[in-house]
Design a protein with these regions (language model features):
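Beta-propeller folds
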Residues: 1-316
Length: 316
């Protein structure tokens, strides 16, 4: 169903029927949590549930039953929150360490050696590699939300440089680890945490310690993790497949080289009707285009072509 949101309510686009109003949600919740209809999220297409979140709580409100079905308290100081709608598990960071809060409010600490002194020498669950190559976050839930792939970044060997924060009313300074060209870069590892066993498996990454590990993508069955790995010179990229249970590298699916640069920006988007094939984006012909990748063979068939670029894959 297509929906139309306004600051006051949410309507069905075709019929014009009002599904729920902001005032109704606040009445059922018991306080002024919902402030704008544009911010309401409907995470389940087949259910009458709307996700409402404040700084302290995350709630699922049933607008047909007119009540709160489920709620989760958000831990204090929680940052980089990553909530999975299926399992309702929440990944988050506090300072340099990574945690999971289960749907039953059980708190699980994944890491203990992350920096807590403000240096950010070692951090978990954050965006890495200077936010390049499509990296926008540091946690990646499996399709069922029971396993969490995450980054661990050690930048203790990288000098800190003063920076200016101009987002504040009066600009302030802070320090930031920045690897200058030719100098030692930070080192990144990829781990997978199993919520059920409370254990972490580290991927046995192929390549050098300063390689870029980008665009992590889960297989639909949750058994394989795909990583686009790029050398520091940024001219040699390999798509690798890793076994989630053991961390071992299963195979190299493909390799792209360039005398200029290779710039992976997107993960794999698997076809809903065929788990062996995924849409891959590549600039191998000089323009960003779509390819159908067979993950069993590594063969990539070009789907779009021309002297133009694909800006975005909207969906299926």
């Amino acid at each position: 169903t297509a929906l139309e949101t306004t600051p006051e309510e949410v309507k069905e686009l075709v019929s014009g029927k009002t599904l729920v109003t902001v005032a109704q949600i606040n009445e059922w919740v018991g306080n002024q949590v919902a402030r704008n209809g544009h911010n309401l999220i409907f995470p389940y297409p087949e259910k009458s549930l709307v996700l409402v979140q404040s700084a302290k709580e995350r709630m699922l409100v049933d607008f047909k039953q007119k009540k709160v079905e489920w709620k989760q308290s958000i831990p204090q100081q929680a940052q980089h929150q990553d909530w999975h709608a299926g399992s309702r598990n929440l990944a988050y960071t506090v300072q340099g360490n990574l945690f999971v809060l289960t749907s039953e409010d059980k708190s699980l600490q994944i890491s203990t050696d992350g920096s807590t002194d403000g240096t950010d020498n070692i951090v978990y669950g954050r965006s890495v590699h200077r936010d390049e190559f499509g990296i926008r976050k540091g946690t990646f839930w499996s399709p069922d939300g029971q396993k969490l792939a995450f980054y661990r970044m050690d930048q203790s060997m990288v000098p800190s440089y003063p920076q200016v924060d101009i987002s504040t009313r009066i600009s302030t300074t802070y320090t930031d680890h920045y690897p200058m060209a030719g100098e030692t870069s930070h080192q990144v590892k990829v781990g997978i945490y199993d919520v059920a066993t409370e254990k972490t498996v580290w991927m046995q990454l192929v390549g050098g310690p300063e390689d870029y590990h980008t665009n992590l993508s889960w297989a639909p069955d949750g058994k394989t993790l795909y990583i686009f790995e790029l050398n520091r010179a940024q001219n040699d990229m390999r798509l690798m497949a890793y076994d989630v249970e053991t961390g071992k590298c299963l195979k190299q699916l493909l390799q792209e080289k360039s005398d200029k640069y290779v710039e992976p920006q997107h993960g794999l988007d698997f076809l809903p009707w065929d788990e062996t094939k995924a849409i891959m984006q590549s600039q191998r012909d000089g323009y960003n285009h779509l390819y159908v990748l067979d993950v069993t063979t590594g063969n990539a068939t070009q789907l779009t072509k021309g002297n133009w670029v694909v800006q975005e894959l909207v969906g299926f």
